Amino acid sequence: MAKNDKINFSTPSGFPEFLPSEKRLELYLLDTIRRVYESYGFTPIETPAVERLEVLQAKGNQGDNIIYGLEPILPPNRQAEKDKSGDTGSEARALKFDQTVPLAAYIARHLNDLTFPFARYQMDVVFRGERAKDGRFRQFRQCDIDVVGREKLSLLYDAQMPAIITEIFEAVNIGDFVIRINNRKVLTGFFQSLNISETQIKSCISIIDNLEKIGEAKVKLELEKEGINPEQTQKIIDFVKIDGSVDDVLDKLKHLSQTLPESEQFNLGVSELETVITGVRNLGVPDKRFCIDLAIARGLNYYTGTVYETTLIGHEALGSICSGGRYEELVGTFIGEKMPGVGISIGLTRLISRLLKAGILNTLPPTPAQVVVVNMQDELMPTYLKVSQQLRQAGLNVITNFEKRQLGKQFQAADKQGIRFCVIIGADEAAAQKSSLKDLQSGEQVEVALADLAEEIKRRLT
């Protein structure tokens, strides 16, 4: 590199990095999510960031996602090794774009080592060639859970998902939210009753999934472009706009099933939906936390039954903050047997970005430390180290200032980091086994015996 060449240290577009205050918020949310996942018996796994490209693209799983391929970058004197790197053809590698396809590959690799139903959680970073813009990232963390069965999987696992979503978002206190539930069989069965072809049904579901985003008028235009006639289009719009309480919607669907021709798929979907709703209620989820929304379709083609989207009440423009559903064939296609599954995903990076911008969440102080032991004189460092260790052993997070600076500057540095307490020990205090405890939050300063220091700080923290 020439002397005058300057390195561009800006992050690549779409690849976020966090200040300590932001990273601590992410860790807090990750810990909360993990605790809830584990309370339901989900076990952690980790899959490689890199998968074989043929795995990621198998059975059309790539969808519309742009995959980041990997190719080794060799120094000029090693270019001859490039053809031997094994990164072409079936050995081509790429970064994973979600965690569902890698889960399917993971189960295929470890089928005989796992117990089914297999309930796992994974909170990893994934990569997509998204158009980088506000709230959209090319690298982001997803917090996923899935339950996968062999041959069959109880619908009560579907019912468990809203209970888990409710516990997580109530724990992080982000305000009122609602989990919108539907069943793809209800939609498919209704479209079949209108004599819409299977190929058209897939397109219709994707279009309906965008109803909230693009509006009714554009949905009608898109449906008509797919060859849906005006009468069918209006019936579809009227159907997905059915609303009311959960019981009202179920009653309307049951009544409708009596009038629909070829309604076997529709009836099965309504029955599954009712089973899931009953399970959600039995798990103690309040009715205010969920509803049936017939416009929720989840555009991904691998969903076959229950689908979910979660929105913040009053902040619907933020979009879904947690979504998922049931799939019958996604995992099984890798293995050659029926392996139904159900899961949800929280796109944590995007969620944090949106909630911070909306003022719904605030960052945490940049350090977990609650206490600073200030440096009054270097000769007392043995005392400072001993006191710091005693406070840590009592369960407090402590920084010891090893460099001596003006006391005011030490206070300023502690306050800037959001640290509440400063422990001040001069020669006289050390001789008397006492300290001055300064509360930077209130400005109060009190004398405390060293033997009582930990308990006094903990008392003030509660």
From Swiss-Prot:
Main localization category: cytoplasm
InterPro entries hit by this protein: aa-tRNA-synth_II (IPR006195), aa-tRNA-synth_II/BPL/LPL (IPR045864), Anticodon-bd (IPR004154), Anticodon-bd_dom_sf (IPR036621), His-tRNA-ligase (IPR015807), HisRS-like_core (IPR041715), HisRS/HisZ (IPR004516), HisRS_anticodon (IPR033656)
GO CC annotations, alphabetized: cytoplasm
Pfam families xref list: HGTP_anticodon, tRNA-synt_His
E.C. numbers: 6.1.1.21
Gene3D superfamilies named in the record: Anticodon-binding domain, Bira Bifunctional Protein, Domain 2
Subcellular location: Cytoplasm
A GO biological-process term: histidyl-tRNA aminoacylation
Record's keyword annotation contains Manganese: no
Keywords associated with the record: Aminoacyl-tRNA synthetase, ATP-binding, Cytoplasm, Ligase, Nucleotide-binding, Protein biosynthesis
Catalytic function, reaction form: tRNA(His) + L-histidine + ATP = L-histidyl-tRNA(His) + AMP + diphosphate + H(+)
Molecular function per GO: ATP binding; histidine-tRNA ligase activity
Top enzyme class: ligase
Assembly, per entry: Homodimer.
Family of the protein in this entry: Belongs to the class-II aminoacyl-tRNA synthetase family.
UniProt-recorded name of the protein: Histidine--tRNA ligase
Protein species of origin: Nostoc sp. (strain PCC 7120 / SAG 25.82 / UTEX 2576)
